[in-house]
């Protein structure tokens, strides 16, 4: 009975912490910019995937986000940033760490990378702080 009660309290604490996490203003603004950029790809038939990934980048640092991609699809990974972080680079790696060739876009506080995998599997999107700035970023991606 004690173990059941402890387990129930543990699950309650985990669910409460997930519910209590609220997006910061910086995350909301970065996501707005990322969605604005992804919307441009929607004009070409890309559908924006549910979900997003936000975080903080330190100067000359990077964040890795794991994604599952499917052969035959095309993808755009769109990133929005919030000042003082102004310039980021978006790149893609396969599960062995090999950098993939992507079509790149960069304009002010937004950047994107386009990719069409030959093989289905797990890939890693890298969001890199290019300059001596830190701040919040948000990644969304589109597919068709």
Model-based region annotation:
Residues 21-46:
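Predominantly extracellular/luminal regions of secreted and cell-surface proteins
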Residues 41-57:
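Glycine-rich phosphate-binding "P-loop"
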Residues 2-3, 20-22:
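N-terminal targeting/docking segments
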Residues 23-25, 52-136, 142-144:
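Acidic, Ser/Thr/Pro-rich low-complexity intrinsically disordered segments
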């Amino acid at each position: 009975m004690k173990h059941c009660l402890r387990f129930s309290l543990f699950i309650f604490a985990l669910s409460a912490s997930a519910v209590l996490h609220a997006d910061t203003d910086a995350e909301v603004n970065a996501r707005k910019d990322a969605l604005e950029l992804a919307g441009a790809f929607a004009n070409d038939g890309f559908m924006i995937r549910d979900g997003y990934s936000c975080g903080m980048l330190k100067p000359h640092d990077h964040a890795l986000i794991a994604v599952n991609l499917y052969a035959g699809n095309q993808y755009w990974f769109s990133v929005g940033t919030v000042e003082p972080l102004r310039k980021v680079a978006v790149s893609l790696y396969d599960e062995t760490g090999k950098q993939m060739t992507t079509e790149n876009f960069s304009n002010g506080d937004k950047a994107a990378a386009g990719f069409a995998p030959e093989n289905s599997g797990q890939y890693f999107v890298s969001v890199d702080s290019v300059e001596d700035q830190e701040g919040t970023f948000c990644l969304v991606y589109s597919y068709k």
